[in-house]
Amino acid sequence: MKRILVDMSLTLLHHGHVRLLRKAAELGHVTVALTIDEEIKRVKGFWPPIKFEQRKEIALSIRYVDDVIPCNWLIDEKFLDDHCMDLLVHGDDYENLVPQNRTVLFSRTAGISSSMLRNDLFN
């Protein structure tokens, strides 16, 4: 069975995340590379409202997720190799540093993102 890595922050879980994870699970054993709090602060400019350990617990409760590991914002091929992963699965807003032959992209779910939810909730 292929080992699939899906990187995400999960600052606000929504149905687009679940759909991506379901598609990833069709390809093999799914490990979520979950962005650490400090990286979210560095890249997005805010501390996540749900801290890493709680986001990890949420991710592990999703039936498509087999494991969760911490990660920085960008994933590179060395990260895949260090964790014995075959493929990186990502939405088509891909910005990582993994070669195309080890990447599977899926279209994002239209009309939803954590940023949109955050904007609706806090503005």
PLM features: what roles do these ranges have?
Residues 1-123:
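Nucleotidyltransferase catalytic core that binds NTPs
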